[in-house]
Every structure is written in C-alpha cells, then in structure tokens.
Amino acid sequence: MAHKKAGGSSRNGRDSESKRLGVKKFGGETVIAGNIIIRQRGTRWHPGDNVGIGKDHTLFALSNGVVSFQRKANNRSYVSVVSMVEAEE
C-alpha cells in the first residue's frame, strides 16, 4: 500500500507586475515634444517650463530641447525643457 498523499496547495506565488517608474530622460539629454521624461506616483518632481503633466503624474516634453532639473526655494524639484537656442547661450 505505497500511496503518496497529495501535497497541499501553496498560498504564495503571487506578485504584481512592475510598473517601470522612474526617470526616462536625464538632465542634459535632448528630447522632442511628446517624449516622456519621468513616470512617477504622485508629484515627486513637478513640471517646469515646457513640461506637461499627465493624469497619472507622468511628466512629458511640450517642446524640443534639453532636459533640466532644478530645486527651487520651496524645496520642490522641477523639471524643465530648455530650447536648443537658449541652451547654446
């Protein structure tokens, strides 16, 4: 009577898919209008000049240029897109 008892089912083995958040274009990188600069939850970075914000707080370029990060007096981080002409000056 060599019977093997059925093993119990495990209650582990579930995990959510990663959301691939984070900075997609870093400071000094060239972007074209519509490029996603940052995917984030909440406003860890705020939109500056020539940057729009989506309903999921994604920051994206509104014009062609170079990405610039800065921290203002209110201690918030802002992301801007500086046009190529301004960047050369």
UniProtKB/Swiss-Prot annotation:
Q: Which organism is it from?
A: Bartonella quintana (strain Toulouse)
> Per the record, which residues fall in region Disordered?
1-21
Keyword Thylakoid assigned to the entry: answer is no
Lineage of the source organism? Bacteria, Pseudomonadati, Pseudomonadota, Alphaproteobacteria, Hyphomicrobiales
Question: Which UniProt keywords are present, listed alphabetically?
Answer: Ribonucleoprotein, Ribosomal protein
**Identification of the protein by name:** Large ribosomal subunit protein bL27
Q: Which GO terms describe its biological process?
A: translation
Classification via Pfam families: Ribosomal_L27 (PF01016)
GO terms of molecular function: structural constituent of ribosome
Encoding gene (name): rpmA
Q: Which domain of life is it from?
A: Bacteria
Q: What InterPro entries does UniProt report for this protein, alphabetically? A: Ribosomal_bL27, Ribosomal_bL27_CS
Query: Is Transmembrane helix one of the keywords UniProt gives this record?
Result: no
